[in-house]
Every structure is written in structure tokens, then in C-alpha cells.
């Protein structure tokens, strides 16, 4: 077990418009930020904001924000964002186990809250 599995890091998330990955829960992290957090490409991370959280598969991207990452505009980014911060927001990120969240997972969470 990696020690970083026990640590949360605050990060800035930017919601991007275009991506082929829009149907998958993918987060693009800056390689230096990922290294500082002990996160590697292909890892699954939990991204949480308030009482909302999802799991994302990590890809590294040099042009991602230095202090965080990019989530393609999708059901996943919309679930974490709100009207005041739908393009950029702060969130916690930590290593997670299991697979990335699916569209069905998001729909199930929303329906359970009603």
C-alpha cells in the first residue's frame, strides 16, 4: 500500500470543453502536481467537493494547471461543479481503489438523493 493513499491534497479543477474521453471519468493532472501527490498515470483517484465525490482514471498532461487538473465537460464534471464555479473549482483529491465512476454511478447517486 502506498503511503499517499492516506493523504488528501487540495487541487484546482478546470472543466474543459472538448474531449474524446467525455463518456469516461478521466482527469488530466499536471505531471509535477501528480508526482508531488504520489499519483501516477493510470491510477484511480477520488475527487471530492463538499458532499459530492467521484472516482477518476488519471492521465498526465503537461498543459494541465500546475496546481491541479482538467476534467472534460461531462456528467462527471457537472456533478462536482455548481452554478458559481462550473468552469473552475477547488476540490480534494486522493488515491482510491477500484474502477473509475460510471455514468450509471452518477445517475444512481442523484436518484438516491431525491
Could you tell me what each predicted segment is?
Residues 1-29, 33-114:
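Long, contiguous, secondary-structure-rich segments that constitute the structural scaffold
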Amino acid at each position: 500500500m502506498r503511503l499517499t493513499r492516506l493523504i488528501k491534497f487540495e487541487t484546482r479543477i478546470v472543466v474543459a470543453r472538448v474531449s474524446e474521453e467525455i463518456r469516461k471519468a478521466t482527469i488530466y493532472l499536471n505531471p509535477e502536481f501528480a508526482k508531488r501527490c504520489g499519483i501516477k498515470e493510470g491510477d484511480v483517484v477520488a475527487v471530492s467537493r463538499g458532499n459530492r465525490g467521484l472516482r477518476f482514471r488519471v492521465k498526465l498532461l503537461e498543459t494541465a494547471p500546475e496546481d491541479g487538473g482538467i476534467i472534460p465537460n461531462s456528467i462527471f464534471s457537472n456533478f462536482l461543479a455548481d452554478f458559481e464555479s462550473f468552469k473552475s473549482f477547488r476540490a480534494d483529491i486522493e488515491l482510491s481503489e477500484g474502477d473509475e465512476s460510471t455514468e450509471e454511478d452518477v445517475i444512481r447517486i442523484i436518484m438516491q438523493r431525491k
